[in-house]
């Protein structure tokens, strides 16, 4: 907070690409890995315990209201299973997603960032604004234009802010800003 991080902190890694989770095993004094996926008992047990503890910690520090459990570009079925685990741990957790638009899970997402080229239905965007939910768009390595690659015309970066304003969105996200083709 003292360094200006006071609006939102996104906490990732519930659904990593490899679905492999590293932990420290005190009994063997070594690092171990567990492979488990949303919908599996081990996944739920592990994450409910962690998120319950994390929720308590965030509340003690006064950070809970600015933290969101975040995911990116996962299939809707995976996100639905993950949302159930998050809600079981603490129904008040905010959830953030950068990915495709899915009407089925949209109401559960505090911060929803969809890929450029997709649109929020106007009534959804207006409702989200009334509910003080963040509604954004993003670009990543998929689309060559517009973007912010080293080969991109600088005007593209300026255009993206105008696009966000024209669509009445809360902002723009350059996903994986350090990942270039």
Question: Could you describe each region identified by the protein language model?
Answer:
Residues 1-93, 98-106, 178-180:
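Aromatic-lined carbohydrate-binding surfaces of glycoside hydrolases
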